Amino acid sequence: MVGIDVPEPKSKCSDPNCPFHGDLPLRGQILEGTVVSDKAERTVTVERSFYKFIRKYERYEKRKSKIKAHKPDCIDVRVGDTVKIAECRPLSKTKNFVVVEVKGEE
C-alpha cells in the first residue's frame, strides 16, 4: 500500500502525515538507524553510524549522522529501537523522513 515492502501497523491513526492511514507519499531513500531521542512531539531522532576512509592516514574513522523523522501515532517507537525510515516531502524545517517500520530493540 505504501510502495515499499513493510508490514502495515496493527493500530489505526488519523494523522494526515501517516504513509499508511494518511496521504503522505514516499519517495527516495530508505534508511535504517537507532532511535536516540523521542522527546519532541511526533518526532524521533535516528542515528546512523558509518565508516569514512581517511586517505592521508590510510585508515577508517567512525562517523555518525542524526536524522529527524516523523513518528505517526500508529507506530510505537522508544529510545534504543532500530527503525526503518523512508524519505518523503519536507514536513518541517528539519524533517524529511518518516518512520515506516520498527525492527526491534538493539
UniProtKB/Swiss-Prot annotation:
Keyword terms: Ribonucleoprotein, Ribosomal protein, RNA-binding, rRNA-binding
Source organism superkingdom: Archaea
InterPro entries from the UniProt entry: NA-bd_OB-fold, Ribosomal_uS17, Ribosomal_uS17_arc/euk, Ribosomal_uS17_archaeal, Ribosomal_uS17_CS
GO biological process: translation
Molecular function per GO: rRNA binding; structural constituent of ribosome
Disulfide bond sites: none
Lineage: Archaea, Methanobacteriati, Methanobacteriota, Methanomada group, Methanobacteria
Protein known as: Small ribosomal subunit protein uS17
